[in-house]
């Protein structure tokens, strides 16, 4: 879902530096105006805000804390917005590791699937510092029909899980 979300950000005028192991996805997004990077580290070296959207908890951990990951290139004050739907304890642990390096994290799992990612009508539940939510609200709304602040870092992931269980 990261590809259509990226395209919506580009259409809204945001400049993007992108990395993905899926080279076809990177090619498609760079053809729309993004710049490609060789790693998450390289993205973080060039950006003050990094958005991750990957399939699961191990992928987020690798992309953020792994070798050549976001944390390797991020400077203090960088903000990570993880839009993946991952295990809440993993989100909390990643946020704690980033905080040690002066990196803030917003947990912003999405609901709605690829069709809603394409048309920019995802639902996003955001956890983290309220001032960061306020600062990045407009950017998140480019990808969503609904962006809701749910409190500190972990409650967003819990809320996402509860919503999924409710829908079952």
PLM features: what roles do these ranges have?
Residues 1-52, 78, 83:
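NAD(P)+-binding Rossmann beta1-loop-alpha1 motif at the extreme N-terminus of oxidoreductases
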Residues 5, 25, 39, 59, ...:
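Hydrophobic alpha-helical segments typical of transmembrane helices
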Residues 22, 42, 57, 111, ...:
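Residue-level "edge-of-site" marker
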Residues 29-31, 48-51, 64, 118-121, ...:
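Short secondary-structure transition/capping segments
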Residues 40-105:
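Rossmann-fold NAD(P) dinucleotide-binding segment
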Residues 85-165:
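Rossmann-fold dinucleotide-binding core
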């Amino acid at each position: 879902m990261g590809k259509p979300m990226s395209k919506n950000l580009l259409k809204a005028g945001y400049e993007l530096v992108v990395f993905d192991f899926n080279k076809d996805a990177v090619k498609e997004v760079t053809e729309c105006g993004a710049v490609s990077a060789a790693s998450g580290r390289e993205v973080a070296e060039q950006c003050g805000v990094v958005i991750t959207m990957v399939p699961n908890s191990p992928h987020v951990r690798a992309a953020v804390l792994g070798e050549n990951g976001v944390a390797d290139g991020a400077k203090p004050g960088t903000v990570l917005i993880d839009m993946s739907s991952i295990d809440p304890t993993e989100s909390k642990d990643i946020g704690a590791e980033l905080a040690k390096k002066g990196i803030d994290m917003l947990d912003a799992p999405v609901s709605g699937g690829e069709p809603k990612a394409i048309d920019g009508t995802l639902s996003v539940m955001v956890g983290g510092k309220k001032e960061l939510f306020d600062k990045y609200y407009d950017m998140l709304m480019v990808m969503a029909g609904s962006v809701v602040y749910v409190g500190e870092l972990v409650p967003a992931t819990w809320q996402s899980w509860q919503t999924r269980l409710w829908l079952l």
